[in-house]
Regions:
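Extended beta-strand/beta-hairpin segments
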Residues: 1-37, 48-128
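Alpha-helical metal-binding/catalytic segments enriched in His/Glu/Asp
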Residues: 42-43
């Protein structure tokens, strides 16, 4: 994988990947917030892909993270609690299996921090 950023001025960067590009607005969102959203976005898409592979649709879906950081610089992540909230016609066992597979195997970003960050999660499926 190769990625790059180009400074555009005014604390904005153009982020480039082989597939696409997008603007990082560090005046509004910190790099740490981009990092955190990348982590939950990675595990979030895994649930959708696994459910679709099994013929299920996921709707009304959001993923949130509550993150605690250390007090001393560089203020690393100490813990991350991820909340998956969605509707889907598959049972709770499948939902837990999909999310567990993502967090323990498939999601590169989560697994890159797993050794140093306590990761936990909650599933809210169909309002329960």
């Amino acid at each position: 994988m190769n990625v790059s950023v180009e400074y555009l001025g005014d604390k904005k960067f153009k982020a480039n990947t082989i597939k696409s590009s997008y603007t990082l607005d560090c005046k509004e969102i910190t790099p740490v917030e981009y990092f955190a959203t990348g982590i939950i976005g990675c595990t979030g898409i895994d649930l959708v892909m696994m459910a679709e592979k099994d013929g299920y649709e996921v709707s009304n879906y959001s993923v949130k993270a509550e993150i605690e950081r250390t007090d001393s610089v560089p203020m690393k992540f100490a813990s991350m609690h991820i909340i998956f909230e969605f509707d889907g016609e598959f049972d709770a066992t499948k939902a837990k299996r999909y999310i567990g597979a993502s967090l323990e195997s498939y999601c590169t970003t989560v697994n890159s921090i797993r050794d140093s960050v306590k990761v936990s999660y909650t599933i809210i499926q169909n309002g329960e």
